[in-house]
Amino acid sequence: MKIVLSKIHWTLITAIYMLGILWSSLQPEVHQKHDVVRETVHNGLHVPAYMMLTFLLVRTFQSYKNTKLRIALWAFIISASWGWINEIVQSYVPGRTCSLSDEVLNIIGTGLSLILIKKIKWLTGGKGK
């Protein structure tokens, strides 16, 4: 089933999602006992969060009839930049830090999303690899 949304819909959905990521970055860390499992899950969520952001950015740029290369480049640049902006913002939140490893996970999620989109042929318009 193909979802057909207008430019404004994709833009709004993407902006709201980006604000959700920012909101989650602004939440102070509650002082809890060091728990490796909780931290691993929390850090692992960076990958799917940025995979979804990249997917939304791709769909937004597709709605504006951009070229495939331009779509992929801008989606990567914006997603990776948003991750870095969020890491910097986090450094000002009590109990939170700016983490290079989190940004690496954000970039991994971004890259995986672009690879999956290409493999699933959303980005290529059904023409394959």
What are these regions (language model features)?
Residues 49-64, 110-121:
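Membrane-interfacial alpha-helical segments at the cytosolic side of multi-pass membrane proteins
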Residues 27-28, 62, 94, 121:
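Short helix-capping/hinge motifs at transmembrane helix termini and TM-loop junctions
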Residues 57-64, 69-90:
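Membrane-embedded catalytic cores of phosphoryl/pyrophosphoryl-handling enzymes
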